[in-house]
């Protein structure tokens, strides 16, 4: 049975975005390369680690707010580097203070430094506290559909399952779990972590993900600005392919041209 998919706007915390690509600000050579790559990506949402980024609180060091304008981009402060719920909640409160009441945050609570897997127990605790405090929580999580469901029930505005380990570039390691999450989801689902090149981003979008967040895939490319542009196109292509619906796979060949009326 064929499924006709209609395009739905990408909405987060009541705001509609045209780009379905979210990008990070870390790992670039300098602030100028950061600025140029983000411009080339077409992204409207930019994430940064609160604990590692100068937003004006450190005098004499490069200030992200002087490179990327809050009038042009939506900032998504994240809790990278946090290993328990208390630390993550404290970091989100700091972000709110530094950004004058900004409520949109990306929650990530890590389990260990080797894998950077999410600690889902601490993530659930932190999410519950942050939602109660009025934060709009986008949450980095495992590809476990049950955990994704619980985070949505708590009140998170988006779930962000990893496709592969952070910074690994391994691509979409478990598309089947992502499919289950997508089938059940009542909030946006964004792939977070694992993307290594444009085809990975396209696959994520073809699965039906609402968006993709990446940093290393662009920043660690040999030519980051060119890769940022490639990712922009990949996201659009993947979304269109998802909406169009791919042809069914067949074991045997099927001729493209009709066989009747052949010239003899």
UniProtKB/Swiss-Prot annotation:
E.C. number: 2.8.1.10
Gene3D superfamilies the record matches: Aldolase class I
Binding site for 1-deoxy-D-xylulose 5-phosphate: 167, 193-194, 215-216
One Pfam family here: ThiG
Group of enzyme by EC: transferase
One of the record's GO cellular component terms: cytoplasm
InterPro entries hit by this protein: Aldolase_TIM (IPR013785), Thiazole_synthase_ThiG (IPR033983), ThiG (IPR008867)
Keyword Protein biosynthesis part of the UniProt annotation: no
Keyword set includes Transferase: yes
A biological process term (GO) from this entry: thiamine diphosphate biosynthetic process
Pathway this chain belongs to: Cofactor biosynthesis; thiamine diphosphate biosynthesis
Membrane-spanning ranges: none
Subcellular location: Cytoplasm
Reactions that this protein is recorded to catalyse: [ThiS sulfur-carrier protein]-C-terminal-Gly-aminoethanethioate + 2-iminoacetate + 1-deoxy-D-xylulose 5-phosphate = [ThiS sulfur-carrier protein]-C-terminal Gly-Gly + 2-[(2R,5Z)-2-carboxy-4-methylthiazol-5(2H)-ylidene]ethyl phosphate + 2 H2O + H(+)
GO molecular function: thiazole synthase activity
Keywords linked to the UniProt accession: Cytoplasm, Schiff base, Thiamine biosynthesis, Transferase
Positions annotated as active site in the UniProt record: 106 (schiff-base intermediate with dxp)
The protein's role, per its UniProt record: Catalyzes the rearrangement of 1-deoxy-D-xylulose 5-phosphate (DXP) to produce the thiazole phosphate moiety of thiamine. Sulfur is provided by the thiocarboxylate moiety of the carrier protein ThiS. In vitro, sulfur can be provided by H(2)S.
Subunit structure: Homotetramer. Forms heterodimers with either ThiH or ThiS.
HAMAP family: ThiG
Similarity remark: Belongs to the ThiG family.
Protein known as: Thiazole synthase
Native source organism of the sequence: Pseudomonas fluorescens (strain SBW25)
Gene giving rise to this polypeptide: thiG
